[in-house]
Amino acid sequence: MSVLSWAFTVAWFTLWMLMLYLTNEMKLKFTDAAAIVNVFAGVSAIGHLGMQFLVDAFIGHFWMLCLSTLAFSFGFGFLAISASPILSGNGQKGLFYVALTVISVGIFGRSISLGVFTEDQLEDGRNKGNPAKLVSFVIGNVGNFVFLLLAAIAMPQISPWFVRFTIPSGCEVLAMLIFISGACSYKRVKPGGSPLTTVFRVFMASASKMSCAYSNNSSQLYEKAECDQDIKPHTSSLRYLDRAAMILQTESLEQQRKNRWKLCRVTEVEQTKSVIRTVPLFATSLISGIVFSLGNTFFLEQANHMDSKFGSWNLPLPLLLLFSEAARLGSRELCVMAAKRHAIDFPESPKQTKTPYGIPVSIILSIFCCSIAAHVESRRLKVVSTQGLLHETVPMSVFWLLPQYILLGSITGIYENSFALYLEETVPEELSQYMVLLNVGVCGVGIMSNIALVSLVGSVSGGKWFQDTINKSRVDNYYWVITVFCMFNLLLYFIVTYRYTVCNKKDGATQENDRRIIASV
């Protein structure tokens, strides 16, 4: 499995520099190039949820890894052909877009299955205490770190872009052959169905009973008394979903139980309610997605027009990504440590009242990140103006961008980890992964929203803020606009969490006074 991770690292660094290919080689306006990158990143994020459903319900992780590796191999192969001298014009552009579409399948397939499949192998009873497996795991992690450094340093040194795109394709083919060679020894967990089906069933059952009058008598709601699963108490919120558990008087209970799409347990209804209650918090992910979209678009374009020398050495731009990734991993560890300390200090704290404190921290850091980026860009543009360097590299060190990249990595790590921990505490365990992926999808929508925001701001500014190149534009003003949006996002977070806390308190009071009579089977 390590070879798949190593190949993914090479692909990751190659895709991170896609903005430079579009502006330097295809000669696109930097806003058009950013739009293409944002659509690609957004689609790659949105597809996670649907792919997770396919993996759980039909495919399984082994075959998903095979599919994702094939997608990477063909996708980068198409990308290499589109960048080669043999193609030009519409054929080149068409194949380029096809390549990105195929690669996006590889991204969300690999992201979903690689970690889970690796854990399955480590937890396999045949491998417990096996020194060879442990050594292989350690070598895999060390090798991944080495590949990070090699990819960051070596990839930018390769001049022809079609060669840069060919290397990830070759790595994926090699990784596929090595991965398949051990297929007989892998532990494979068969797809057991998706827990998301429960949510669909509740919506379908409640919709089928829309014409039925709702009764406040909770004794008319169905629950399976001898079920091995935890039984969740009935709550008063989102009452329209309670119809899914209503026992109709026109049919016998035995007949209704046979159709699971028309009668659900109260516990299943309450699980669906817990999912819906967290959805408003996802609104904060839209603006966070806009901030995330800057790292491999506008920030990278700034770096491309700045002095990257460190002494006599030309600093490879992907090293900025390494600093950002290090900040992301470090901030995630801090979040985990803070969560453990909170659990020790406040063991009696009920899960329903916990709020994701890491999210407002990440939003505050977003405000700092965008404001710092605005100040740095203002300084850079001042150098451009005073020295007349509209078409030249600006004699200003790329290290000026380091704070905003480190902040961006910290924001990503804190936000992702805080949201994941929060969802683990507030939604059923089997659905928490889907909610995490739903949040990733909403972030993807936010990333693509950057396109609309750039278009809107460009129209309002009369085209002065966004011109052909970043040296002629006023991206610093755009960063200030995003800073204001982040401030609004912080206010939105407090409104949503306050509303969520109030609703939970009402549900808690209702549970004490609204005891149902369980319909025994």
Swiss-Prot record:
One of its GO terms (cellular component) is membrane. It is a multi-pass membrane protein. Gene3D superfamilies: MFS general substrate transporter like domains. InterPro entries: MFS_trans_sf, POT_fam. Keywords: Membrane, Transmembrane, Transmembrane helix, Transport. GO terms for molecular function: transmembrane transporter activity. Pfam families: PTR2. The chain crosses the membrane at residues 3-23, 35-55, 62-82, 96-116, 134-154, 165-185, 279-299, 310-327, 356-376, 394-414, 440-460, 478-498. It is found in: Membrane. Belongs to the major facilitator superfamily. Proton-dependent oligopeptide transporter (POT/PTR) (TC 2.A.17) family. This is Protein NRT1/ PTR FAMILY 5.5. It comes from Arabidopsis thaliana. The lineage of its organism: Eukaryota, Viridiplantae, Streptophyta, Embryophyta, Tracheophyta.
